[in-house]
């Protein structure tokens, strides 16, 4: 068992980039046919993979900055300007700040000059996964707008999913909702 975050990386934690592919190749060469991992969902307070916001969404910390460069959404220079991540432990605060920064850059680049193939893939994914993705993206956008507070501490109409309040949130937070979908 090895969680991808335990793979070697210069970017704070291991991700689903080149080192994950190398690990899978190693498993295959050793005759292994399975890679057992801990849950891969987005984590909240405490950063435990067993305490996730979603059964379906992926943890954005597992997005490889190098693959975003390959897709033309970031530059090598942008990911080279990473913080000095500690060795031997994870500084989740530093990681979140940096990952959120580069994911925002990648999203802006995607929105302003979308690659046709990437755009088509995104739209296909968003349509295919809308049964969970729409609510998840709304939840994350509202959580961000609420200062990352626990949903139990949100204003009563939001907490109780008042239809009119949620519709207003969908309109007011449209850009952030799309960003959350993009990160998936």
Would you name each region that the model predicts?
Residues 1-184:
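Acidic/aromatic-lined carbohydrate-recognition and catalytic surfaces
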